[in-house]
């Protein structure tokens, strides 16, 4: 990745709220499925803004800070997705998105950010990001990158 795009908490909340507005009326949704870990943050905002208390997770590992690796499904919410919003922070290459589409074919799949390779795989997103740009999300940052406590 040649460029970095740094996202602040304020930016992230603003974009997530914009996504929530596009998902109205809230009464059409049974719940939210957050793609762990990046989708947990927008899921919290969507849950609050739409008044949805039923939040599930699908745990798919594909990244280790700045490297994309093999896809592993660790946990999956048991539904075909009907009436659910599936949310992730980003769609990048589309590898995770393809797996999500197979798992939850009837869900509305949304992300905050989308890169060109993955954008056609989601139903909606807020911000376009160039394919060669790495996103530094606010939960990964202090004044610089902060490794998770478990890695120390």
Curated annotation (Swiss-Prot):
Pfam families on file:
Pribosyltran
Gene3D superfamilies membership: 3.40.50.2020
Positions contributing to guanine binding: 92, 135
The membrane topology of this protein is:
Peripheral membrane protein
- A single Gene Ontology CC term: cytosol
Give the subcellular location: Cell inner membrane
Q: Which domain of life is it from?
A: Bacteria
Entry binding sites for xanthine: 92, 135
Residues recorded as binding GMP, renumbered to this chain, are 92-96, 134-135
Its annotated pathway reads: Purine metabolism; GMP biosynthesis via salvage pathway; GMP from guanine: step 1/1; Purine metabolism; XMP biosynthesis via salvage pathway; XMP from xanthine: step 1/1
Q: Which InterPro entries does UniProt cross-reference here?
A: PRibTrfase_dom (IPR000836), PRTase-like (IPR029057), Xanthine_Guanine_PRibTrfase (IPR023747)
The residues that hold Mg(2+) are 89
Q: Which UniProt keywords apply?
A: Cell inner membrane, Cell membrane, Glycosyltransferase, Magnesium, Membrane, Metal-binding, Purine salvage, Transferase
Q: Which reaction does it catalyse?
A: GMP + diphosphate = guanine + 5-phospho-alpha-D-ribose 1-diphosphate; XMP + diphosphate = xanthine + 5-phospho-alpha-D-ribose 1-diphosphate; IMP + diphosphate = hypoxanthine + 5-phospho-alpha-D-ribose 1-diphosphate
Top-level class of the enzyme under EC nomenclature: transferase
Q: Where does 5-phospho-alpha-D-ribose 1-diphosphate bind?
A: 37-38, 88-96
Chief subcellular site? membrane
Enzyme Commission designation: 2.4.2.-, 2.4.2.22
Co-factor requirement: Mg(2+)
A molecular function annotated in GO for this UniProt entry is:
hypoxanthine phosphoribosyltransferase activity
The family assignment reads: Belongs to the purine/pyrimidine phosphoribosyltransferase family. XGPT subfamily.
Complex formation: Homotetramer.
| HAMAP family tied to this protein | XGPRT
PANTHER family assigned to the protein according to its UniProt record, in alphabetical order = XANTHINE PHOSPHORIBOSYLTRANSFERASE, XANTHINE-GUANINE PHOSPHORIBOSYLTRANSFERASE
The protein's job, in short, is: Purine salvage pathway enzyme that catalyzes the transfer of the ribosyl-5-phosphate group from 5-phospho-alpha-D-ribose 1-diphosphate (PRPP) to the N9 position of the 6-oxopurines guanine and xanthine to form the corresponding ribonucleotides GMP (guanosine 5'-monophosphate) and XMP (xanthosine 5'-monophosphate), with the release of PPi. To a lesser extent, also acts on hypoxanthine.
Q: What is this protein called?
A: Xanthine-guanine phosphoribosyltransferase
Top-level taxonomy: Bacteria, Pseudomonadati, Pseudomonadota, Gammaproteobacteria, Pasteurellales
